[in-house]
């Protein structure tokens, strides 16, 4: 039985999204038990109304809610009995294998980092997310906003934890291909930080394929793409905006005149397939990667379907025992990085 902790009060709409999303998820997974944190009276009423299988749900009452615009340090210091904090605590205490929240991103990252700590050798956790491609391939992108300014060593650490996660979830694919997001594919391109990161990764034990431009990411050329949080967040928002723009443009074009409306009827199966493939809700659920516990961040403005997919992400990670596999692989990879760094420093010193 897989047990997940759910922050039922988090997100823009709270219970209106988390409860139906959790109910649909439980109906699809008879091997899951949920610990839902929040106001017990409100939560029980909402679950009953949704027809949730109460025999597989424990309610953990909390008296506080972290606001979506609340400062992370304030939430950490003053909201120790919040639905978010208590959900993360379930993972720390071994009562749940993963926690899911649609709440304040900064507060969740601060809380998870404080409660769970980072994997030994990993300085900072990163926000990671699987992105679609033009094939059935998916690519893990990180960091998507947690760390806007990174050292080469930290970027290399992101590459390590990203590679280990993909390998844990998809061992049949072999060693994941790792790409470094840059303004060009040549190793002379980019900032000093990116150039130094390139050299570290080149001498590591990772399957480093070199620099990758953002316009290639959705073509499945890499299994893991690494960037600092500033570049990664801009990249993600650009992709999301482009998908939304194209979807709207196609819809408006097919509705513009009678001929196009008739053409839309003929193209309906293909359009439905495209819509399903690009549905952002299917890729909801960012991973706070690098922690000694599985924490999934759902988009705060998602609907019940999107929240269900965030629970799916937590479920798959918990079921694959990804965390223990990551921790085992990280030590070896980080040792190789230290060797690469020493060689790099020696070469610089010899100039």
Swiss-Prot record:
Keywords (A to Z) from UniProt: Cytoplasm, Lipid biosynthesis, Lipid metabolism, Phospholipid biosynthesis, Phospholipid metabolism, Transferase
Reaction equations catalysed: a fatty acyl-[ACP] + phosphate = an acyl phosphate + holo-[ACP]
A GO cellular component annotation in the UniProt record: cytoplasm
Gene3D superfamilies referenced in this protein's UniProt entry, alphabetically: Isopropylmalate Dehydrogenase (3.40.718.10)
InterPro entries per UniProt: FA_synthesis (IPR003664), Phospholipid_synth_PlsX-like (IPR012281)
EC number(s) recorded for this UniProt protein: 2.3.1.274
One Pfam family from the record: FA_synthesis
Superkingdom of source: Bacteria
GO biological process: fatty acid biosynthetic process; phospholipid biosynthetic process
Purpose of the protein: Catalyzes the reversible formation of acyl-phosphate (acyl-PO(4)) from acyl-[acyl-carrier-protein] (acyl-ACP). This enzyme utilizes acyl-ACP as fatty acyl donor, but not acyl-CoA.
Similarity comment: Belongs to the PlsX family.
Protein name: Phosphate acyltransferase
Species of the source: Neisseria meningitidis serogroup A / serotype 4A (strain DSM 15465 / Z2491)
């Amino acid at each position: 039985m897989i047990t997940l902790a759910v922050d039922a009060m988090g997100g823009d709409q709270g219970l209106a999204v988390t409860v139906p999303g959790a109910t649909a998820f439980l109906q699809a997974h008879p091997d899951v038990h949920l610990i839902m944190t929040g106001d017990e009276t409100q939560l029980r009423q909402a679950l009953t109304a949704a027809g949730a299988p109460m025999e597989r749900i424990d309610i953990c009452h909390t008296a506080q809610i972290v606001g979506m615009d609340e400062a992370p340090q304030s939430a950490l210091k003053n909201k120790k009995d919040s639905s978010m904090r208590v959900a993360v605590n379930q993972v720390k205490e071994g009562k749940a294998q993963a926690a899911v929240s649609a709440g304040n991103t900064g507060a969740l990252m601060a809380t998870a980092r404080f409660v769970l700590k980072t994997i030994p050798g990993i300085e900072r956790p990163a926000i990671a997310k699987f992105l679609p491609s033009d094939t059935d391939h998916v690519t893990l992108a990180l960091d998507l906003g947690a760390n806007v300014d990174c050292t080469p060593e930290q970027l290399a650490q992101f590459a390590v934890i990203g590679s280990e996660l993909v390998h844990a979830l998809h061992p049949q694919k072999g060693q994941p291909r790792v790409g470094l997001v840059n303004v060009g594919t040549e190793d002379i391109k980019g900032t000093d930080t990116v150039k130094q990161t390139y050299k570290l990764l080149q001498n590591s034990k990772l399957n480093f394929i070199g620099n990758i431009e953002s316009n290639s990411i959705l073509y499945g050329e890499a299994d893991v793409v690494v960037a600092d949080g500033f570049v990664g967040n801009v990249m993600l928002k650009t992709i999301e905006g482009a998908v939304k723009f194209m979807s709207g443009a196609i819809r408006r074009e097919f509705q513009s005149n009678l001929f196009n409306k008739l053409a839309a009827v003929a193209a309906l199966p293909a359009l439905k397939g495209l819509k399903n493939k690009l549905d952002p809700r299917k890729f909801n659920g960012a991973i706070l990667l690098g922690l000694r516990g599985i924490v999934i961040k759902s988009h705060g403005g998602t609907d019940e379907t999107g929240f269900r997919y965030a629970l799916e992400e937590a479920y798959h990670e918990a079921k694959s025992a990804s965390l223990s596999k990551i921790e085992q692989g990280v030590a070896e990879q980080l040792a190789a990085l230290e060797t690469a760094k020493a060689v790099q420093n020696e070469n610089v010193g010899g100039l």
